[in-house]
Amino acid sequence: DVYKRQYEAYTELYRVSKDAAVKEKLCWILDVFAEKVYNPKKQRQEVFFDKNYNSIIDLHSYGHDIETAWLIDRGVEILGEEAYAEKMSPITEALTAQIYHVAFNGHSLANECDKGVVNTHRIWWVQAETVIGFLNGYEKQPEHLEYKDAALAEWEFIKNFQMDKRAGSEWFWEVDENGVPYPDRPIVEPWKCPYHNGRMCMEIIKRIK
């Protein structure tokens, strides 16, 4: 997750500065992702590595993959290098397709798969990134109407179940696949803030206006 946050920050820094050193780092991160982080056989990104970039855990993080797909596309767009568009676009398309087929159940996205065992909890940030990720996939490949439908269905799930409708509240940290909240999770704490869901709202507004 660290490289992705660096990439996200460098993307916006390069957008406003066009600094050559920042561009160099963006390209380096994309190269590392394509050559070390992305697993083409499993069409997913690996999560934890040793110092030589060997994967050390069998974990498919569905939320990180759908988030990464649109973040990479955004960075490549801002980078403006055709070679990187050709290199990265097939990867982000594969990530989006794989998540749609293995993790989306028609209305929301499961959390992750750890050593073959799927965690079906619906985590607040995963649901937020799902809306952006599938809308991004549809914008890139408008023939894939299922991505548009998935983004709309996810948004309905969020409104009906992920949002805590109590006055002054926020989104539930997690609910089960039927939308029932887990009561032991706080609404806000150091690992739970409105970053992902706030960004989702702003991102969707920009994309559909």
Regions inferred by a protein language model and the residue ranges of each:
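Glycan-recognition and catalytic cores of secretory/periplasmic carbohydrate-active enzymes
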Residues: D1-K209
